[in-house]
Amino acid sequence: MKRHFVRIDLTVPGVGTLINIADLVEVDAQTCTVNRMLELDPNETITGAYIHGRCVGRINEPQAAVPHPDSYADFPDIEVTRLDPEEYEALWTEAAAKFPEI
């Protein structure tokens, strides 16, 4: 099971930028599922978390299947930054301190 740790900045015209930090599990070359995800506000403060089908705090629930990070170049409003697993875990630890129920 190959995993991808990514920061996704989605720009929504007239609204702003949505920031998600995701732990994705590769299904195939085009598709992943979301294992865990964090949502950040524009000040990069963690506002919510998603794990095991559960949302805590302020976060949008992810779709069952999401595009593979390698395909994000096809989406003009999405910027993706790959993270090391350690970087992701540090952010998840910060979220767990804020939301102990995760």
Region locations from a protein language model:
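Broad, structure-driven detector of short, well-ordered beta-strand segments within folded domains
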Residues: 17-28, 38
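Short, compact, well-ordered microdomains
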Residues: 63-102
